Structure formats: C-alpha cells, structure tokens
From Swiss-Prot:
Gene this chain is encoded by: SLC17A2
Family: Belongs to the major facilitator superfamily. Sodium/anion cotransporter family.
GO biological process, one term: sodium ion transport
Primary location class: membrane
GO MF entry, a single one: urate transmembrane transporter activity
Name of this chain's protein: Sodium-dependent phosphate transport protein 3
Annotated organism of origin: Bos taurus
C-alpha cells in the first residue's frame, strides 16, 4: 500500500494542499449558491407556491386571480415592486432540471479536456461564466420562461466544467491516505453554501426583493474567480509557494499511481467494468434524492408546513448544517479507519455508502407519516441531507481508488449519471405534486427511497477499491 511515504509527512493543516481544499470549498460554496438561488427566489417569483391550494390551478388563470388569493403574502415580503410570474409546478420542474441538462452536456468532454489543458483554467472559466449568468438571471426572467431555461442550461454547462475539473486536481494533490479528508473539506462547501443561500435568501428577498439574491451571489462568484486564478495551480510540482517537504510528501505518496504519458482512454474496458457501474449506480441513486431536497425543500416547507418565504428559507437551511458537518466528520473518520488499519479500503467505502443511502431512505419514507408534526418533520428533513453526505467518503471518491489515472474523466461520467437522475427526479416531482399535493409528496419520497435501495444493493454487490487492470501502469496494460 502507500502508507510508507506518509512517514515523512508534512504538517497537514498549515500545508498548501489544505489551503487548496479551503479555496475549493469556497468555489463549491459559490456554485451551489448560484444553483440554489432559484429554489428560494421562486417562492417570491411565483406566488402560487405560497398557496398550497393553488397547485392545481391552470396556468391560464389571469394574474389578477393570483393577486386576489395572495395579496397579504405579497405585501408581507415586499414583492409587489418586482415581477411575479405564472409558472405552473410542471414548468418549475423543467426550470429546476434545466441546469442539469447543461451540466450533463459538458461533464464528459470537460473531464477529458481538463486532463489535457489543465483543470485550473477549466474550473476557473466555468465558475466565471456561471457567476455572470447568475447576475443576468433576473433580467432574463422578464423575457419569458424559455430564455430562463436557456440561461440555466448554459449555466449548467459552465458548472459542469467546474465540477469535473476538481478531481483532476485532487488526483495530483491528494495523498491516498488524505483523500477522504481533503475531498470532504472541499465538498462540504456545497452543503455550507446550501445552508447560507437558504438561510439568507428569504431575508434578502424580503428586504431587497428577489432579484438581489442573484445579484449578491453572482458577485461573490466573481470575487471567488479572482482568488482561484491567483492562487491555484494544477499540480504541486509547478506551484511557486509550496515547501520542498510538502512537495516531496505528495509526490512520493502518489508515486505508485503516477500517470505514464497520456494515451487513449480505454472505453471498452470501462464499459465492461462492473465496479465502475457500481459507482455510477451509486451516483444515480444519491443524486435522485439529493436533487429533490436541494431543489424542492423550500417549496415543501412552504406548502406542507405553511410558512412564509423568510421562515421557509431559514428552515430549509438547517439540513445543510448537518450535511456540511457529516461531510467533514465522515472524511475524518474514514481516513482514521484507514490510517490505523482498522478496516480495509473497500470496507470503508461500502460502510459509508451504506450509511449514506440507507439512512436518508428511512427518513424519506417516514416523512409522509409525520407531516402533522412540525418538529418531527424538521428533524427528518435535517437528517436526510446530513446522512446522505456520508456517501462522500464512499462511492463518491471511489474513482480515485479504482482508476486514479482517469479520475476526472470517470467523475464526469459519474456525475452524468447523477444529473440524469436529477433531471428525472425534478421533472417527476413537479408532475407528482401538481396532481395532488399530499399523495404527490408521499409518492415522491417512496420512489426516492426505492431508487436509493437499488443503488445500495448494486454497489454492495459489485463495488471494489483495487486499481483496475486497465488503469495500471504501462507494464500491466493491454497490448
């Protein structure tokens, strides 16, 4: 194994690689706030979501009809000065899922190109484009729903470039025994960003109007881009500020997995590799439920618990405190179990995958039965994202174990499977809750639990953690 190089390990939390993890944390924070901004703003943009009884109304109803039924709510959070749109739940589902269409379009090519041209430029450019499009979202909404869908799709393409490039960087910066820790610090930015945007988004909408949600977090993204291009380098060998000790530690730790000169990607071997399909099915299942929670949580709390936009945002943010905490703690625990040789690598991956798929499924199944209990509902909603993020130390980073040389490319494919699940679940959720709010939400959560169980069984059956034969060095590759 690769434990020996760690004997001359450089200091961890004062090291450049942990600084890189923090900057990537901020980048993930920025991208998720830009993605989730619409989920909280739409409560004010489409005042129908404030009134659960209006889910079945036709989109042809005149706007005056909507104002008559929600005049007090509009005055309450001061959206009378900004536009209110007639978007049905089905239309909202399409808008929510459109960003996933864009991400899918760029995940695989950007993962491949990041390995050629460098992840720094790929990720930075994606973050910049996403930030600029966020700033223009309020303007495009006035020109119609089609343009909003187009903008969100292009924004998804930009974020797909940014998401995928991260694993190219970690393949060169993360020592094997620190992978869970470093990637969990970086990945927790998404959970923390969800917490912040959902917590303050409603307050911003109430105080300044919903367009300022996009203006503020789009501007933060532009600042993050400046930091990214200034500090980040593709690998430790070329960073001007890294210490010799840390550079030697990283290089020696990765020596057994270093890439030989780049060749064509062994697509046929990948397609026939069941451990890879186990990872893909894990992503599909995980993203199905996570997309529903991230996208529809404010709407669920608003329509089922009957709270206003400010309280809906604050309540929606609470689950992501648990998510960020579980991501970091899960990474620490996984690396502890590995460094002390308490469990084998595959056992750790399957343990955290099991916890991350089974526990949120149980909570989701229980939700429809406790809808009358405000406190119990909130507790379960907090537990779903928290326990789900334990997967970050399971199959989420499993590509770094089975094929580190192709980690970025395979991460693109993995996220592609996850985003296909997100598109289906977002659209299906919009359709189900438009038919009947009560039974619709019950069917949404039951279906999500079933998908999670399928992914868990598949991963437990076929998941592995050894480097696959087609991903090894030249002497072991096919003729």
């Amino acid at each position: 194994m690769d434990e020996k190089p760690s004997t001359r390990k450089s200091p961890e939390f004062c090291s450049l690689r942990y600084g890189l993890a923090l900057i990537m944390h901020f980048s993930n924070f920025t991208m998720i706030t830009q993605r989730v901004s619409l989920s909280i703003a739409i409560i004010a943009m489409v005042n129908r979501t404030q009134q659960p009884g209006l889910f079945n109304t036709s989109t042809e109803r005149p706007l005056a009809f909507t104002f008559n039924h929600s005049n007090r709510s509009i005055k309450e959070f001061n959206t009378a000065e900004v536009s209110v749109y007639e978007w049905s739940p089905e239309t909202q589902g399409i808008i929510f899922s459109s960003i996933n269409y864009g991400i899918i379009l760029t995940l695989i090519p950007s993962g491949y190109l990041a390995g050629i041209f460098g992840a720094k430029q790929m990720l930075g450019a994606g973050l910049l484009i996403s930030s600029l499009l966020t700033l223009f979202t309020p303007l495009t909404a006035d020109f119609g729903v089609i343009l909003v869908i187009v903008i969100r799709t292009v924004q998804g393409m930009a974020q797909g470039m940014a998401w995928t490039g991260q694993f190219t960087i970690w393949a060169k910066w993360a020592p094997p025994l620190e992978r869970s820790k470093l990637t969990s610090i970086a990945g927790s930015g998404a959970a923390f960003g969800s917490f912040i945007i959902l917590c303050v988004g409603g307050l911003i909408s109430q105080a300044l109007g919903w367009p300022f949600i996009f203006y503020i977090f789009g501007s933060i993204g532009c600042v993050c881009c400046l930091l990214w291009f200034t500090v980040i380098y593709d690998d430790p060998l070329h960073h001007p500020c890294i210490s010799i000790r840390e550079k030697e530690h990283i290089v020696s730790s990765l020596a057994q997995q270093s890439s030989s000169p780049r060749r064509s990607v062994p697509i046929k071997s990948m397609v026939r590799c069941l451990p890879l399909w186990a990872i893909f099915m894990g992503f599909f299942s995980h993203f199905w439920l996570c997309t529903i929670i991230i996208t529809y949580l404010p709407t669920y709390i608003s329509s089922v618990l009957h709270v206003n936009i400010r309280d809906s945002g604050v309540l929606s943010s609470l689950p992501f405190i648990a998510a960020a905490s579980c991501t970091i703690l899960g990474g620490q625990l996984a690396d502890f179990l590995l460094s002390r040789n308490l469990l084998r690598l595959i056992t750790v991956r399957k343990l955290f995958s099991s916890l991350g798929l089974l526990l949120p499924s149980l909570c989701a199944v229980a939700l429809p039965f406790v809808a009358s209990s405000y406190t119990t509902t909130i507790i379960l909603l907090i537990l779903i994202p928290g326990t789900s993020n334990l997967c970050d130390s399971g199959f989420i980073i499993n590509t770094l174990d089975v094929a580190p040389r192709y980690a970025s490319f395979l991460m693109g494919i993995s996220r592609g499977f996850g985003l296909i699940a997100g598109i289906i679940s977002s659209t299906a959720t919009g359709f189900l809750i438009s038919q009947d709010s009560v039974s619709g939400w019950r069917n949404v959560f039951f279906l999500a639990a079933a998908v999670n169980m399928f992914g868990l069984v598949f991963y437990l059956t076929f998941g592995q953690a050894e480097i696959q034969h087609w991903a090894k060095e030249r002497t072991l590759t096919r003729l």
